[in-house]
Amino acid sequence: LRDRDEELGHARSMHLIMAHVCEENPEYAAFYKRVAGEDYVILDNGAYELGAAAADEMTLKWVKELNPSEVVLSDKLFDRDETIKRSKAFLIKLQKLRFEGKTMAVPQGANAAEWFECLESFRYREDVHTIGVFLKAGSLFPEGREDLLNRVKQLKRFGDKNWHLLGSDTMLWELQRIPHLPVNAFIRSMDTTKFITCGYAGVRVQDVMAGTATYPERQQDYFRLPFPEEKILEIIDNNLNVAEQLLRKPWSF
């Protein structure tokens, strides 16, 4: 994860967290209550995990509990019209709460044209600060999410918004390539569990990147995994060191 927003300069870390996991896991929620005042916390609605945004009332509950730095607006996977409808309705609810943080809209669509139409509905709104591009949006474009980002840049559709990449590909090609590409200039940040997921499975991430190991799918109980034993912890540390090395590459922020 890397940010280019000067407003984040004071923050030690950026966290993307799930509203539905806050609801299910008191320990998880308590941790983010502690760090929300110092770190940059993005509250996600869990659309990728649940197939549709977690109930608005649940997400709003955790907006009030945590006062996060940024909130992901309601959306529905691959559904342009429902995403626009839900996001606009959620913005009204946030206004009623007098939420003063930032908001992230996540364009959706059944094809590339619909995705761009959805983007246009958010691009000029002053109450939308960030555009989130979820990983599977890349399936709408011939060359994946990198193709999507290149088209955004060519069409000059990035505007004055921050851009955040939701999730990473299993081979981590994007983290290896995007720092060297022109699209890097408007991307603020990325979140991914890949380095931790590999570690818990005993897999060194450099082996996945080299194609000599297969990426293990994230465990269903990922958010409830116990603290790792020493051998697994060593692999997780290795994977996080690889992440640090990738982030030292020449991002043009």
Where are these regions (language model features)?
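Alpha/beta catalytic cores of nucleotide-metabolism and tRNA/nucleoside-modifying enzymes
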Residues: 1-3, 57-63, 81, 92, ...
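Short, well-ordered coil/turn segments that N-cap beta-strands
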Residues: 13-14, 37-41, 67-69, 99-103, ...
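Conserved beta-strand positions
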Residues: 18-19, 73, 133-136, 165, ...
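Conserved radical SAM core fold
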Residues: 72-80, 112-113, 131-142, 172
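Short loop-to-alpha-helix "cap/lid" segments that border enzyme active sites
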Residues: 98-101, 109-129, 139-163, 178
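Non-catalytic, usually N-terminal nucleic-acid engagement modules in DNA/RNA processing proteins
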Residues: 1-97, 244, 251-253
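Conserved, mostly hydrophobic/aromatic
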Residues: 44, 105, 177-178
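His/Asp/Glu-enriched short active-site or ligand-binding loop at hydrolase and phosphoryl-transfer sites
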Residues: 128-140, 189-196
